[in-house]
Amino acid sequence: MPNNFRLAKVSSLLKKEITLILQNDLENDLIRDYFVNISKIDLSGDLQHCKIYITSTAKETVRKEIVANLNTAKSFIRNNLGKRIEMRRVPEIIFKEDIVLDKGLSVLKLLDELKNKHQDKNYEDKDANS
């Protein structure tokens, strides 16, 4: 089992190379039309399996379609990875949507709503006391 340094190094290399493949080699209009970013890579300890989390500026339905297209093209991407990097075995890859950004935005929205309600209540209290 590789150490954490090796996992981090291989993950970083995979992220860099897959990003280049998505930008330059993959001919998919949907992926090219929207900003697609690899936010995180989870690589198994034996370097055999890789989950790639992506974010995009697209709407939720389009993001799901982008993930489906990437999973359809994963053999092409994996094949290109094998040509670009020296590994005994290129890991099996699966693309997933990273929903952390959406969750963060909804938390910020809730906080803004609470702040506005609190400000409105303070304003009403001041009017009542005047």
UniProtKB/Swiss-Prot annotation:
Protein known as:
Ribosome-binding factor A
Cite the NCBIfam families for this sequence: rbfA
* Location within or outside the cell: Cytoplasm
Into which family does the record put it?
A: Belongs to the RbfA family.
Describe its assembly. Monomer. Binds 30S ribosomal subunits, but not 50S ribosomal subunits or 70S ribosomes.
| UniProt xrefs under Gene3D superfamilies | 3.30.300.20
Q: Which organism is it from?
A: Prochlorococcus marinus (strain MIT 9312)
Single GO term (MF): ribosomal small subunit binding
